[in-house]
Every structure is written in C-alpha cells, then in structure tokens.
Swiss-Prot record:
Pfam family, one: CdhD
Name of this chain's protein: Acetyl-CoA decarbonylase/synthase complex subunit gamma
An annotated Gene Ontology molecular function: iron ion binding
Lineage, opening ranks: Archaea, Methanobacteriati, Methanobacteriota, Methanomada group, Methanococci
Keyword Phosphoprotein in record: no
Cofactor(s), names only, from the UniProt record: corrinoid; [4Fe-4S] cluster
Length: 488
C-alpha cells in the first residue's frame, strides 16, 4: 500500500515564511490545500527560486498521484485524464471526470466532417446546475488514405476548439498527421509490434503528444510503458482491449492495471486507462448482443449496447472513453453517471442559501421554504418552471442536506428560518406572513411558527405536486390569513 502523506510532510519542505503570496494565510494552510488538490505548487513563488529547487521536486514526488495526470488539447480546451490516488471513491475522491470522445471517420465528406465536429462540440445538457458536455473528437483514418486523414484533421481543428485524438495503427500515417496537427493530440495507438516505429516517429516529428499503448496483456503494457519512459516519452495512456462479447475480461484488465498502480505502486502501470465502447457499437450492428431482443432496430440496439458498456467500464476505472453514438438518449445516462461518480464525497453538494424569485412574484405570491442541497434545489426549481409556478423560494442553509435528512439532523429549524427571513428581507416583499413547508418537514411547523411569527402551511411531499396545490389552495389560504389578521 502507498505511504500515507500528511500536510506536515509537505510543510517541512515549504519556505515557512507565511508570506501569503500563494493566496493562503500560512504555509501550513498551503500545504493542506496542496494535499487536497485545491492548490498547485506553482502558486508559491519562493519554491520557483533556485534555492528551493530540490524541495520543489521532493514536494512534487510527494503529491504526485499513483496514476499520472495526463492531458491533451489546446490552451482553450484540455481533456485531462488520470490523477487518481485510491481504488474506491469513499477512501478520498476520484479526480478528473472521464473525458468522453466521439469519432469522426475521414471517409465522410468535408461537409459531413464539419457538421459532425460542430455537433460534438455543441452537445450539452444541464443537470443540477452543471452543463454536461463531450470532451474530445477522435479522427479515425478509416480510409487508409493519408491525405484524407490530414484533411479531416485540418477541418476539425479549423471548425472547433476541441481536443483531438488521431487514430491509426500505422506509424507512417501518424507521422504525416502529426505534421498538420496544431494542438497537443492523443495518438491512438501503438501496439507491441509497432511501438519502436511510433517512438521513432515521435522523436523525428518532435511533437508533444499523448501516446496510447494498446494490448490485451498487462505485462506487455508494462514493458511498453517502460520502453517509452526510457525514450523520454512520458505522457502515456494504457488501452487494454475492449471486448464487447466478454466485457468481464476488459473489466479484469482494468482492475489489474489500477490495482498494480495504486496498491503495488507500479510506476509502469501508473497511467490513465482508455476504453472503447465504440467497439460495442460496431459489434452489436453485426452480432447478437444481450439486449438484441428488446428492439427491432439494429441501430438502436447498437447505441443502447454502447451506452451500457460505457457505463460498465466507467464504473471500473475507465479514465477516458471513445464512443460513436450522438443521440441524447444514449449519452445522457453516460454523462449523468460520470457526474455522479466524480462528485466529491468530502464536500456537501450545496447551493447558496437565500431568496430566489421563481417567475415574476409579487407581494401576494406564496413563500416556499426548502433546503440548499443542490439536487433538491434544482429538482424543485425545475419542477416549478415546468409547471409555471410563481413564488418566492426561500433556500435555507442546511449544510447541503436534503429536507428529510436536515429535519432529522436538526438543521431545518426555526432559528435558521428566522435568520433566513431577516437576511433576505422577504417580509418587505410580501403582504402576508405565510410560509409553505414541504410535507417531509411538517414536524418543524410549530418550531418555525414560534421562532419566526409566520404562519406555516404544510404543502406537498413532492415538488412536482406544488403547482396543483397552489392553484387549488393558495387563494383560499391567503384570503383566510388576511381576514384573520385584519380581524385581529
């Protein structure tokens, strides 16, 4: 098992001047942030001086993860892979969400290449406030023609700012392609038989690249990586073969590589893993697969199978994926799973507490109280917008906990509600003193009424039911409250 590094180990190598030039109040604080990957070593200007050169190298060795962080792309967009330190997310966190690339064949017409490249770059959907996108474009030399390949590369780089992977098993084709590539590309792929030729090509062209090493044998991948490192090629990616007909074999290879890197500290296997769900797509077009019986359309079957394989591989250490399908229904589950896997379990997923107007609320609009757990917030606001709900949404600071959890933990309470009402000035924006609570928070009604002096109404269990609840009840609730308070 790798040695556990502490902030004190890093602190001992820092200047200890507490100059604050790094942006943190002390060297110990900076050491802690370095350990947590929330700061970079270049933020300390003193470490960049000749006097601290050796210390800087030692710190880099200490904080470098067992799986090397590798990137390709350009100044505007980079695809970053690897950087993980643990086998399981609960042990720390996973870093650098798996870049997902989609292929473009050089057999397509120039217009088709241009359109597909734009489609890949512009693909986006939003979930819980985060925009989920594709990360790179794979240009395949399907034609075998060098000129077509070079032209496709030029079109993609001209039309988009996406990082690119150039894919050919022929080192001579790659050599010519590298002459026209402007950015730092990922090169797919060198095999055991062609590795020497690829090393020669990279040295001749003198181009900064990420080289993919492809083999179905872990020992061969290790030997290939050792040879590359000996030749000064350090940005490597390992590609154990992806077997759609027997995906368990690929999963075993992924686990063996990652376990060797993290638990056995094998530096020759400490590189990102690339998997190819695209193989599953083409396999399913020509062969029966586990989901063939569910759909008649072969294309639909192939894309469903590709997405299934992609998710399976991402659950077992795939640091980058290459796919073919572009349908939203295929990519949405893959990108959603990626977002979930790479959520940092050490940090609550929270939004800023405060007052959020939904629609165009006025003085007679309802006031609804929820929590600042991000999934709750975005689900609630999404449901409200779909159902044309107009209201004032009060978002309480519950430490990023959901309604039922914060009620049980005591964060959803009268004191916090009172503080929120005072800080947001909601009392000046409405003519009533009514707060609608989620049904799951019904037990806090008395406490909130006592602490705030507002009347609490228990609403629905689910935010999708709020629209109907307000349309059927709000006017009556408001009228009764005004009559009661005018009488009083």
């Amino acid at each position: 098992m790798p040695k556990k590094i502490s902030a004190m180990d890093i602190y001992k190598l820092l200047p200890k001047t507490n100059c604050k030039k790094c942006g943190y109040p002390s060297c110990m604080a900076f050491a802690t942030k370095l350990l947590e990957k929330e700061a970079t070593i270049d933020q300390c200007p003193i470490l960049n001086t000749p006097k601290f050169e050796k210390n800087k190298k030692k710190i880099i060795e200490l904080i470098s993860p067992p799986v090397k962080e590798v990137w390709f792309g350009n100044e505007e967009k980079k695809a970053v892979m690897g950087g993980d330190e643990v086998m399981y997310r609960y042990q720390l966190s996973f870093f650098n969400p798996t870049p997902i690339g989609v292929d473009i064949s050089d057999e397509l017409s120039e217009e088709e290449i241009k359109n597909r490249a734009k489609e890949i770059e512009n693909f986006v959907f939003e979930r819980t406030g985060e925009k989920l996108k594709l990360d790179f474009i794979v240009i395949r030399n399907a034609s075998g023609d060098v000129e077509k390949f070079k032209k496709a590369i030029e079109i993609v780089e001209k039309e988009t700012k996406m990082p690119i992977c150039i894919a050919s098993l022929n080192p001579e084709v790659i050599k010519e392609a590298l002459k026209v590539v402007k950015s730092k590309p990922m090169v797919y792929a060198a095999t055991k038989e062609t590795l020497n030729d690829f090393i020669k090509v990279i040295k001749e062209v003198k181009k900064d690249v990420v080289l993919v090493l492809s083999s179905n044998n872990v020992k061969d991948l290790k030997n290939m990586a050792a040879k590359c490192l000996a030749n000064g090629i350090e940005d490597l990616v390992l590609e154990p073969h992806t077997y759609p007909e027997n995906i368990a074999e690929t999963l075993d290879l992924n686990v063996m590589i990652r376990r060797s890197a993290i638990e056995k500290e094998d530096k020759y296997l400490g590189f990102p893993i690339l998997n190819l769900p695209i193989n599953a797509y083409y396999y399913a077009l020509k062969n029966e697969c586990p989901i063939s019986g569910f759909f008649e359309d072969k294309e639909v079957v192939a894309k469903m199978f590709e997405a299934t394989i992609a998710n399976t591989l991402m659950n077992r250490y795939a640091d980058a994926l290459i796919m073919h399908g572009m349908d939203i229904w295929e990519l949405m589950p893959v990108l959603t799973l990626r977002q979930c896997i790479y959520t940092d379990p050490r940090k609550p997923q929270a939004v800023e507490p405060g007052l959020y107007p939904i629609g165009n609320p006025d003085e007679n609009s309802p006031v609804i109280l929820t929590t600042n757990f991000s999934l709750t917030f975005y689900t609630v606001t999404g449901d409200f917008e779909k159902d044309n709900v107009t209201c004032w949404l009060l978002v309480m600071d519950t430490g990023g906990k959901a309604v039922d959890v914060s009620v049980a933990g005591g964060q959803y309470n009268g004191e916090n509600a009172k503080k929120l009402i005072e800080e947001t000035g909601i009392a000046d924006k409405v003519s009533h003193r009514i707060i609608i609570l989620p049904a799951l928070a019904a037990s806090t009604r008395g406490d909130i009424e006592d602490k705030t002096g507002w009347t609490c109404v228990v609403g629905t269990r689910d935010s999708s039911q709020v629209g109907d609840f307000l349309r059927n009840n709000w006017d009556k609730i408001l009228k009764e409250w005004k009559e009661k308070n005018q009488t009083a």
